[in-house]
Amino acid sequence: MKHLIATFALSILTTTTTWAVPHSLNTWAKDSTEVKKDNETNKKKPEKKEDDYEKLMKKGGSFQQGLFDVRHIEKDWYFEIPEAALGRLFLAVTRFVSVPQDFGMLSGEEVNYNTVYFERYDDKTMFLRSWAHSQTADPKSNISELVRKATIDPIVYKFDIIGKDKKTGKMLVNVTKLFKGDNKIAGFTANDRTQVKLGTLQDDRTFIDTIKTYPINIEVSTLRTYAANPGKSMASRQGFMTLSLNTSIVQLPEEPMRPRLADERVGYFDNRLVTFSDRETSKHDAIISRYRLVPKDKKAYAKGKLVEPEKQIVYYIDPATPKEWVPYLIQ
């Protein structure tokens, strides 16, 4: 009897042990799913690389908001140009601010002027083109598209687009070389230098003094030094001449003024144009240069009455003008 009980107990123990082994193995085994989750959690996310715009912004510098946002970072000047400004016409005018004695030209006189516009060539390149038009056609005519495609405006400067402001989409370009260099926008051309008897520009003695931006214009002041052949002026005898220039960049109205044909009986300055038509003909027109005067009282103006303009023509008299001359200048 004892032998049977012992045999039965051993049988139960063997059965229990057989089933217990798999249970203990399951306890020690690692869950492959959990390991995968741990690996995903510990995996480092790739670091976001800074673009050139973000790297430059970290350097700080000064900032002005206006027609174009202007940044001055270390020794360089930058414009942030919005998409809306591409293709818009701007008038660039450069004048003398101060000149050497006996230079032959006076402060306030014009150095050059140009109508320009910005054009994006690709994601990395922007052009500054001169709007050089002497041929035109009625926009409603079929030939106007042919005139547009068959002609092209000169590129006066090329910018590298450094990057974009991700919030505003404005494109950042470096304008330092544009305003420190000699070109038709902000300095002298080779022909201009010959006329005023200036030699080559001295880069190490040429500086951008200030760039100030306003709602519809930007003002750039530069100090320039040129080599010079000895002449009658004391400055030229030193072998160099230094002068100060100011360049104004003014945004022109989006809707251009209605052109008016010249009449030889009235003394206006004019601009000559060749106008093409669908009839395979062309004619020479002269468009006068005039102020954009819009009558304040249009009904009275239509009746032939003298009325005031919406925007007055304003002349500024230099505060250095002798007081006894001022009344006569106003008259």
Task: Explain the meaning of each model-derived region.
Residues 7-16:
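Bacterial N-terminal signal peptides
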Residues 19-20:
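Intrinsically disordered, low-complexity polar segments enriched in Ser/Thr/Pro and acidic
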